[in-house]
Amino acid sequence: MKIMIVTDAWEPQVNGVVRTMQRVIAELEAEGHEFDIVHPGEGFKTMPLPTYPEIKLAMFAERRIRERFEAFEPEAVHIVTEGTLGMAGRKMCLKMHHPFSTAYHTRFPEYVAARFPIPTWAGYNFVRWFHKYSGRVMVPTPSMVEELEAKNFINLVAWTRGVDTEQFHPSKRLEEGAVGDPFEGLPRPIFLNVGRVAVEKNIEAFVELDLPGSVVVVGDGPALEGLKKKYPNVHFLGAKFGDDLATCYASADVFVFPSLTDTFGLVVLEAMASGTPVAAYEATGPKDVIPGSNAGTITPIGGDLAKGATDCLTLDRATCRTYAEGYSWKAVAHAFLENLQPLPTPERRRFWQTLRRKKKTWIDWDQWTSKQDT
């Protein structure tokens, strides 16, 4: 199948949205599916997102997206994000009367409210409007589906996440004092958080905990420098990638996930796959993954997360690994494929034949008018 992906989130951004789509695309490309990925780095005029300059917003994108659409002739269009590119892709599909699917990867209203004086109800009105005409809205967890249904969203389907169990593996654990120990010189146990260092991630709830050993944060983001100054006893290691990141996960004793705004939290599975138990609040994502797993603890929001974190020290690391092995990227990719909204074959054939005829007419007219001008 030929699939057009429209996304405001792509490299060099490092987040769960980008990692999810990269892995799904890689799995499906290996099976022969073709992709055209439309993202801000593809020659669009961009402007930095206020308060978060690392994120670029593509401007005046509709014409260029339509040109890509006509050149690629996709069988399905999937819109990943609700940003400026996502808006342009949605508008194009509606104008062209072409079906499309969307995804609800992030709590957009909460993210916006954390940065600007915009109430969450206004954000949900926008997001509900954005997804209204999507043939299928892919949502990370069943609890997120229930929450959005209660807000009158339609066409929702649960679409879980996977984890690379080869990249994230207990064998990469380095014990205290070993050569290459990423936490060299730090008192044990190691309580770790990995992710974007931003206000919406609720990282302060983690670094303020009274925990034994060492509190470590791996990641970069707009809140990093401020947190470094405010919490000098916390160890901020910056962004890590590849084997360096995998070694951090596996060498930690407990992974602490304080976020209340994630819709899933890929890092939770990455930690478990590395053999590291997870302590989290009872928020969307963790409450769908952790209960019954024996691979972590769930704390009611506002409860004692420090106790949940220290309780994780008694959990069996092998059990964490076994549980994470049940999340396959191949299954996630196939579910994505099944949720796309392609036109039926006869209708698709007529759609593109009609569009080609119109395009040829426009070209012929342009050539004719240019001759009249000379």
What is the predicted function of each stretch?
Residues 224-243:
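Nucleotide-activated donor-binding/catalytic signature segment of Leloir-type glycosyltransferases, i.e.
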Residues 277-280:
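Short hydrophobic beta-strand element within catalytic cores of glycosyltransferases
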Residues 180-216:
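Conserved donor-binding/catalytic core segment of Leloir-type glycosyltransferases
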Residues 314-364:
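A charged, aromatic-enriched C-terminal amphipathic alpha-helix characteristic of glycosyltransferases
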Residues 69, 240, 247-252, 336:
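Short alpha-helical donor nucleotide-sugar binding micro-motif in glycosyltransferases
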Residues 125-180:
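Donor nucleotide-sugar binding/catalytic pocket of nucleotide-sugar-dependent glycosyltransferases
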Residues 260:
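Aromatic "clamp/platform" in nucleotide-sugar-dependent glycosyltransferases that forms part
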